């Protein structure tokens, strides 16, 4: 559940930073969002798996 929450937060932050305001732009960038979110979650999982943050 916590990972899903982080996924939503990361996607919202990325969308805000990249300036995707429209639904069409977001739909065209779903693959990009998924790639970035997967990388971020992998890094967070790796760090939290090795260290207690």
From Swiss-Prot:
This is UPF0391 membrane protein gsr2640. The keyword Cell membrane applies. It is found in: Cell membrane. Belongs to the UPF0391 family. Keywords: Cell membrane, Membrane, Transmembrane, Transmembrane helix. One of its GO terms (cellular component) is plasma membrane. It comes from the Bacteria. Its main location: membrane. The chain crosses the membrane at residues 4-24, 32-49. It is a multi-pass membrane protein. InterPro entries: DUF1328 (IPR009760).
